[in-house]
Swiss-Prot record:
Entries under Gene3D superfamilies matching the protein: Vaccinia Virus protein VP39, Winged helix-like DNA-binding domain superfamily/Winged helix DNA-binding domain
CDD domains registered for this protein in UniProt: AdoMet_MTases (cd02440)
Protein name listed in UniProt: Uncharacterized 37.1 kDa protein in transposon TN4556
A GO MF label: methyltransferase activity
One Pfam family cited in the UniProt record for this chain: Methyltransf_31
Any one of the GO BP annotations: methylation
Transferase in keyword set: yes
Length: 345
């Protein structure tokens, strides 16, 4: 750990009152998840004392407690306010409504990239019937309608009444598009009635991905195409000097935020089990160099707060993580898999 980091940890540990060396380290571990080595701890104390940011108190037995000086407390408060303002300017803490989030996500470079690959792989043709499983607010229904026009049809299905209403409003001038309220696990469609289908970041959220794929297989005609795009959240990497903190964040996303956090790596196997052939798997890695752009997709601050509440990250470590990410330079990456499946006769 860098000396400046060690000094700031010592200042934070002393914020609530005087402590001696062992107790300082215990307080540091409680808020950051780590202890300082003896050299780092006592070196930090010596430097802080030289800067008149801490001062020793009268020894109690063999223990020598330290406390913050007024200058040390002022510095600690100034740093905390400064970094909180910085991370607050970069990251959004409020949870956006689902429609706004999906609309915002669709405009990102990452989404445009993989959606283009999915559309090419689906190869929807004029006159075909195309199914969008979990269509959301209708983001991709217009594109599908254009691909199957003039005589084809597009069916969007979603389990959310709000999403269905949004999708219907957005496609009311597209007569080829139908939007239905339905459960991906029990589709309201006849066997073999669909030529091609897609599912876009939906299977990561459903209760039973295997059942959803079995239903997709049922409604597709023999030879029909299913294209799926799903992230593998265990592939999420975020550059941070303390690797354990970034790993803990990724574990929390995979374990708690996303129901099926590693669905991306499972898609090909699940499709084969459901009776599909799987001719193509395309990995697409989205790289983020801008913290605000990454926050649109990853929800860094709100999910960090959840990680603290769930016990995956200590509070101080999480704030330092957000401060570091906000200050930059920033790097994050996550891999999404586009899997092309074909219904076997």
């Amino acid at each position: 750990m860098r000396t400046n980091d060690a000094q700031m940890l010592v200042l934070c540990a002393l914020a609530d009152g005087p402590l001696h060396g062992y107790a300082i380290n215990a307080a540091i571990e409680q808020v950051s998840g780590h202890r300082l080595g003896p050299g780092s701890l006592y070196g930090a104390l010596a430097r802080l004392e030289a800067k008149q940011l801490v001062r020793p108190l009268e020894e109690k037995g063999r223990q020598r407690p330290f406390c913050l000086t007024p200058a040390g407390r002022e510095l600690l408060e100034r740093e905390a306010h400064s970094m909180a303002r910085l991370s607050g300017r970069v990251f959004e803490s409020a949870v956006p409504d689902e429609v706004s989030y999906l609309d915002q996500l669709a405009t990102t470079d990452a989404a445009r990239s993989y959606k283009s690959v999915m559309l090419d792989a689906l190869d929807a043709r004029p006159g075909e019937s195309a199914l969008d499983l979990g269509c959301g607010p209708g983001t991709d229904l217009g594109t599908l309608a254009k691909a199957v026009s003039p005589s084809g049809r597009v069916i969007g299905i979603d389990s959310s009444q709000e999403m269905v209403e949004q999708a219907r409003r957005r496609t009311e001038n597209l007569p080829a598009v139908e939007v239905e309220l339905g459960d991906i696990h029990t589709l309201p469609l006849e066997d073999g009635s669909i030529d091609c289908a897609r599912t876009d970041r939906v299977l990561q959220h459903v209760a039973d991905p295997a059942q959803a794929l079995a239903e997709a297989r049922r409604v597709l005609r023999p030879g029909g195409r299913l294209v799926m795009g799903e992230p593998d959240w265990d592939s999420l990497t975020i550059d941070y000097p303390d690797l354990e903190v970034s790993r803990a964040y990724t574990r929390h996303v995979t374990d708690k935020i996303v129901r099926n956090g590693v669905i991306g790596r499972q898609l090909a196997r699940l499709a084969l089990d459901a009776g599909f052939a799987v001719p193509t798997v395309v990995p697409i890695t989205s790289v983020f160099r801008d913290a605000q752009a990454a926050d649109q997709v990853l929800g860094l601050q709100r999910n960090t707060e959840r990680a603290v509440s769930a016990g995956y990250l200590p509070a101080l470590a999480s704030q330092r993580w957000l401060d570091h990410l906000a200050a930059g330079p920033f790097f994050a990456a996550v891999t999404l898999y586009v899997v092309v499946a074909q219904a076997t006769p």
